[in-house]
Each structure stands twice: as C-alpha cells, then as structure tokens.
C-alpha cells in the first residue's frame, strides 16, 4: 500500500527492471552489452550484431549446436515454456528483451518481461491452444499482434531440430508434473491474493477501474 506525501495512491507493484540496469545488477556490473527489445528496438550496443543473429535464424537447417553457440538455447526454451503455460498472448512479438555481452563468445539471452496478459486475463479458457496460436497467426483474430511469423520464426526454426523439439517436449512434461500446474501455482498465488483482497477494491475505485 503506497502513500505519497501522505496521500493514498493505492497498491504499488514493485518489480525488477528489464533494461540494462537489470544486467548491471545481476551480472556483476556488466555494462558492455548489446540489447534489443521486441525484435527491432535497439536499446544498447550494436544493431549489426543483432541483425547477424536474425539473418542466421531466418535460414532453415541449422543444428542445435550451432544455435547454442550464439544464444542460450535452454534459457530460451524455458522462457517459451513459461509463457505458453501462462497463455501469454502478448508475447513473443511484444514484451521480450534480448541481450548479450559484447565480449567474445557472448550469447544472446532473454529477459522475462510483463506476463500480466496471461493466466486467463479477459476470460480466456484454460484449454486455449497456445501452441496452435504460436504457429498460426490467423488462429485468433482478436489476439494477432504478438504471433506474427517474424516474431515466432526463431522458435519454429528451433523446433525443426529433432534434439531441440525432443528436449522442449520433455521439459514441458517434467515442469508440468513438478511446478507448472494448478496446485503449485495456487500455493504461491493464494497468499498474495489474500494479502491484497480487501485493499484491491479500494485501489480500483481510486483509479476508476
């Protein structure tokens, strides 16, 4: 609950930044990086490095090992699984930040950002087929800005590799049998819900929501 100069401002959502400050804080003060948001917005560094990566994955036929030399494949896999589980339809064409160290051997990595579009927002069913949505930009005309072909191409190219697709499916099964399921989600969510449940209507009234 947030007050500014004694004036009630409702509930303040504090979250970690998703820009170069995140890297500086979590990577021992690293500053020399390339960073691109939403596939084409240069935030830090050299766009040529990013364009070289895009040119690489636009082509078919690269192996898991080739990809893993220039990007953190398993981290990307985890980020995709996370957003598919959330049914986040404001990703991957939006709310995605790529970065890499400029030092030799630096690989592209992903920062998770803004997943509030998921977990049934706007009444989407738990049976919504996020995989089909990811592969077909015409699957849902009301949610068709973040699944355009240019935004899903990297994932689709990686899924053409047998090793990647097998590991992706295995990880989905393991995660959903362990922590990506209703019971574990509710175990984390319920205390947070109970903490703000009485305050939230007051917050919404303040902002006429």
Feature locations, PLM:
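Middle-to-C-terminal accessory/interaction subdomains
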Residues: 1-3, 8, 12, 39-209
């Amino acid at each position: 609950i947030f007050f500014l100069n004694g004036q009630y401002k409702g509930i303040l959502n504090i979250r970690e930044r998703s820009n170069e400050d995140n890297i500086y804080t979590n990577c021992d003060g690293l500053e020399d990086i390339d960073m691109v948001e939403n596939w084409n917005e240069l935030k830090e560094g050299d766009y040529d490095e990013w364009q070289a990566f895009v040119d690489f994955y636009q082509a078919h036929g690269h192996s898991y090992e080739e990809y893993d030399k220039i990007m953190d494949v398993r981290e990307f896999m985890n980020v995709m699984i996370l957003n598919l589980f959330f049914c986040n339809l404001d990703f991957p064409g939006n709310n995605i930040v790529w970065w890499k160290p400029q030092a030799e051997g630096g690989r592209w990595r992903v920062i998770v950002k803004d997943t509030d579009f998921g977990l049934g927002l706007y009444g989407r069913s738990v049976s919504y087929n996020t995989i089909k949505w990811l592969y077909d930009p015409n699957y849902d005309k009301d949610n068709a800005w973040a699944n355009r072909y240019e935004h899903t191409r990297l994932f689709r190219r990686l899924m053409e590799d047998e090793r990647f697709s097998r590991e992706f499916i295995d990880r989905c099964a393991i995660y959903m049998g362990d922590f990506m399921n209703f019971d574990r989600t509710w175990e984390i969510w319920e205390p947070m819900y109970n903490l703000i449940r009485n305050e939230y209507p007051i917050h919404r009234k303040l902002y006429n929501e």
